[in-house]
């Protein structure tokens, strides 16, 4: 019995280091997301189409369309160690973008849970420039 316990303990120790280097993204409500975007060094990433972006986006947001054929090439140019606040219209595309970013090695990712729709419903500012 002691031998079995020792084998299990050693196996658990060695296998605990096998889980990948992924951190879960965090889904935030509009107010929390706004606070996150105002933190120093956080990059706000709008993954909607350019047409959606020009109709109204968060201040200082960078636009990279997750559904364009260039998304992976564009995110490859970004700093993987930076913190990103990612949003779209409803939260679906931003979650897809976050999953792709995780697969590319990004670890500090925050999602606007219900997208810019939630942001606007909360009365938070959008810009069109």
Question: What spans do the regions from the language model cover?
Answer:
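Rhodanese-like catalytic fold shared by cysteine-dependent sulfurtransferases
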Residues: 2-8, 13-42, 51-83, 92-129
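Structural scaffold elements adjacent to functional motifs in cytosolic proteins
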Residues: 44-46
């Amino acid at each position: 019995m002691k031998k079995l316990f020792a084998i299990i303990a050693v196996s658990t120790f060695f296998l605990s280091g096998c889980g990948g280097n992924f951190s879960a993204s965090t889904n935030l409500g509009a107010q929390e997301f706004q606070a996150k975007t105002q933190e120093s060094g956080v990059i706000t990433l709008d993954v909607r189409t350019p047409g959606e972006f020009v109709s109204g986006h968060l201040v200082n947001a960078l636009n990279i369309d997750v559904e364009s054929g260039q998304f992976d090439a564009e995110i490859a140019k970004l700093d993987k160690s930076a913190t990103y606040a990612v949003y779209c219209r409803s939260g679906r595309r931003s979650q897809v973008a976050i999953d792709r970013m995780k697969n590319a090695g990004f670890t500090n990712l925050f999602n606007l849970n219900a997208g810019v729709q939630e942001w606007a419903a909360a009365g938070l500012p959008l810009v069109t420039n």
